[in-house]
């Protein structure tokens, strides 16, 4: 936490030998909060929270995260076996203005997405920390001119659900977009955030299992190769991976790929690193 903090503290010190009670209130005004595991900073954090010993309870707080407004509140509790933290988040963000996506992708997006989330953190007194996150939103007001299957008009509902379960070493991120797209991934926490393995399954009704080895598997619907090549030529892959490491073994499967006035059916493309560079097989 960076910046000036105003606080009031009241100590109740019994003279009969009972435990001291510390109560008070803390006021934040345009502070910055650095989140180390994400290498990200909440800016302009403002609001109040009160405490009674180790139990904290905040009022609604406001902040700016990824250049977007954020509403947040939290509470903590000293449980019998663990210190527990609960956080509620919500916002209405414009994906094209987060500063995270490549310029070529930003140009193809417009609109905003309203979302809310809950974070639960368990800090056992005699074991390692665990946490869970659930985010829900709807891309109904987002318009995308990206190639299919990422194209969508504004006004078309596309509910998104994301869940995270993890500890200090790794976490699994899963979820779905609409009724027929599911994804599953495992991330490792170390010097850098590392995607160990992931899978995206289109036209699926259930969560797919993780790949058996490190890598990314993309099971996609029919694709227009020319549109995707044009997007990559505009730099759609630039700046991706700046804050994280990604596997070099990638498998793409599609029932149909059109490219150069040609059409390939039931295609599987595998890209993997070699001593001399990258080997791509189809």
Regions found by a protein language model. Name each.
Residues 1-173, 186-282:
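Membrane-proximal interfacial segments on either side of biological membranes
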Residues 67, 178-182:
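Glycine-centered tight beta-turn/hairpin loop motif at sheet-sheet or coil-to-beta transitions
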């Amino acid at each position: 936490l960076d910046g000036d903090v105003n606080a009031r503290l009241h100590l109740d010190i019994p003279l009969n030998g009972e435990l001291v009670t510390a109560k008070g209130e803390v006021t934040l005004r345009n502070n910055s909060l650095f989140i180390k595991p994400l290498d990200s900073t909440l800016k302009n954090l403002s609001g109040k929270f009160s405490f009674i010993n180790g139990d904290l309870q905040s009022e609604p707080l406001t902040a700016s995260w990824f250049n977007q407004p954020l509403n947040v509140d939290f509470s903590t509790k000293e449980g019998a076996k663990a210190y527990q933290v609960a956080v509620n988040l919500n916002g209405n963000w414009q994906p094209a203005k987060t500063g995270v996506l490549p310029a070529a992708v930003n140009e193809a997006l417009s609109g905003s997405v309203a979302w809310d989330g809950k974070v639960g953190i368990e800090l056992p007194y005699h074991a390692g920390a665990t946490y869970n996150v659930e985010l829900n939103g709807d891309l109904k007001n987002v318009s995308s001119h990206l190639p299919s299957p990422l194209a969508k008009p504004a006004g078309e509902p596309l509910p998104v659900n994301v869940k995270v379960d993890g500890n200090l070493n790794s976490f699994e991120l899963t979820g779905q977009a609409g009724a027929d797209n599911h994804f599953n991934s495992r991330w490792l926490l170390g010097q850098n955030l590392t995607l160990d393995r992931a899978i995206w399954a289109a036209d699926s009704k259930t969560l797919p299992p993780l790949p058996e080895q490190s890598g990314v598997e993309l099971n996609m619907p029919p694709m227009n190769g020319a549109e995707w090549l044009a997007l990559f030529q505009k730099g759609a892959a630039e700046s991706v991976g700046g804050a994280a490491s990604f596997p070099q073994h990638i498998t793409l499967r599609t029932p149909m790929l059109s490219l150069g006035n040609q059409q390939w059916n039931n295609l599987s493309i595998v890209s993997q690193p070699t001593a001399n560079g990258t080997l791509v097989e189809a």
